[in-house]
Design a protein with these regions (language model features):
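Short glycine/proline- and acidic residue-enriched helix-loop micro-motifs
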Residues: 72-80
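Conserved subregion of the PPM/PP2C metallophosphatase catalytic domain
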Residues: 114-119
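Short, glycine/acidic-enriched capping/hinge loops at junctions between secondary-structure elements
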Residues: 34-40
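Active-site glycine-rich loop that binds ribose-phosphate moieties when present
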Residues: 160-176
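SIR2/sirtuin-family catalytic core signature
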Residues: 1-24, 30-34, 45-49, 54, ...
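Active-site glycine-centered loops adjacent to acidic/histidine catalytic or metal-binding residues
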Residues: 27, 109
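Active-site-proximal beta-strand elements of phosphoester/diester hydrolases
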Residues: 144-149
């Protein structure tokens, strides 16, 4: 079995030879590397104040606000450590994008770590959000496609956007763009738990023959995260040609991306 770096480099080389540049999908794990709490991390703090709730994720945040109010949510978030501007994984992503390896990025994060890293490295980019209709363009400029508009102060974003209502409102729009773009390009998932129901539901909605025809994609995640996925979801990803590249921990994920960026020049 090839080493993770060789498996990923080989995947990129195969696509480059075929004239394809994968979409780089950056999830919450990348922001966590810069000190931002993941939704799962926020849940831990919320459950300390609301131990009786059986909800999780977006529904738990909405439940917390309904029971204790937005001011209490703000107080809980205020106790979380202040994050850093960006982390080595963001610098690696910027270098990869600047080298033309992955000129299109999708992100579901609420912060500006990606943009900050691109500015520091000196990579020109254009940013669009899902509220805008967009078509992936050719050319030299990197495109950053955001699920959530107006990123900035993460605490304000969590209070305003991480809610069941906002999640449901964004659902059909994201599915539309998944169907429009992921049918035509391979994807590399980084910092993603692969449990986002919008992605899984979109894949499940496709006929088996359509899933089989999707470009091969790769998910870079820890073994623990992969095993945490329900077996039916692992089977669903496999049916859509999504294969995992497994690493022992999150530090190794960062190391993989840094090494890949070094190879890209």
């Amino acid at each position: 079995m090839p080493q993770p770096i060789d498996a990923l480099a080989g995947f990129l080389e195969q696509n480059r030879d075929g004239g394809l540049h994968p979409i780089l999908w950056i999830g919450a794990g990348a922001s966590a590397a810069a000190g931002y709490p993941t939704l799962a991390g926020i849940e831990v703090f919320l459950r300390q104040k609301l131990p009786g709730s059986r909800e999780a994720g977006f529904a738990l945040v909405a439940d917390f606000v309904a029971e204790l109010g937005e001011s209490e949510l703000a107080a809980v978030l205020g106790g979380v450590a202040e994050p850093r501007p960006f982390a080595p994984i963001h610098t690696a992503v910027a270098r990869l994008a600047g080298a033309g390896v992955c000129p299109v990025l999708f992100t579901t994060n609420y912060d500006r770590t990606i943009e900050n890293a691109f500015a520091e490295v000196g990579v020109a980019f254009g940013a669009q959000c899902l509220e805008d209709d967009f078509v992936l363009q050719g050319g030299n400029q990197v495109q950053i496609i955001r699920l959530h508009c107006d990123p900035g102060d993460w605490r304000s974003a969590v209070r305003a956007v991480v809610s069941l209502r906002a999640f449901e409102a964004s659902y059909p729009r994201l599915v539309h763009h998944l169907d429009r773009n992921l049918r035509t390009r391979p994807v590399i998932f980084v910092g993603c738990s692969m449990r986002d129901p919008r992605l899984l539901d979109w894949l499940a909605s496709l006929p088996v023959s359509d899933r089989r025809d999707l470009h091969a994609s790769r998910a870079i995640l820890t073994r623990e995260e992969w095993l945490r996925l329900a077996p039916p979801n692992r089977d669903l990803l496999a049916s859509a040609n999504v294969k995992p590249i497994l690493l022992p921990d999150h530090e190794s994920v960062t190391g993989l991306m840094v090494e890949l960026a070094g190879r890209a020049g």
